A protein has these predicted regions:
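Short active-site neighborhood of thiol/selenol oxidoreductases, capturing the structured segment around
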Residues: 1-21, 34
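Structural alpha/beta surface segment adjacent to cysteine/selenocysteine redox centers
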Residues: 18-124
Length: 124
């Protein structure tokens, strides 16, 4: 079976969904080939870190810093429930274009490394 999905390494829900998908595949004892496609949630995100995830949430959604911390903490809790060593609160907001380029290079030149690379990029 081949599964194609679009993902951004800056998206915590993509990481959580990827973890859930892999668990289901393992539980069902399926053989799967993944085709991971790039999707940039924010093409205009700066390359240089300018804000924390909490600050970005506050600005993007018009929240107080305290409310943004609560939202980010809820997302972290979802990841922890899935067994992810999730520290979303301390994630720095930056552009993911180069990470997607690296993934494309791996897919083209060393496809056997793609899953490990994807996990490493999510955990970075």
């Amino acid at each position: 079976m081949k599964i194609t999905y679009w993902s951004d390494f800056a998206c915590p829900y993509c990481y959580i969904g990827n973890t859930r998908l892999k668990r289901a595949i393992k539980d069902l004892n399926l053989e799967v080939e993944f085709d991971i496609r790039a999707f940039e949630l924010d093409q205009n995100a700066p390359k240089d870190v300018q804000s924390t995830t909490v600050e970005r949430f506050a600005q993007k959604y018009g929240l107080s810093i305290e409310d943004a911390k609560k939202q980010v903490s809820q997302i972290s809790s979802l990841g922890i429930e899935e067994g992810i060593d999730f520290k979303y609160e301390s994630t720095l907001y930056t552009n993911t274009r180069d990470a997607h380029r690296l993934m494309k290079l791996a897919q083209d030149k060393h496809p056997e490394t793609v899953e490990k690379l994807a996990t490493s990029l999510f955990e970075a």
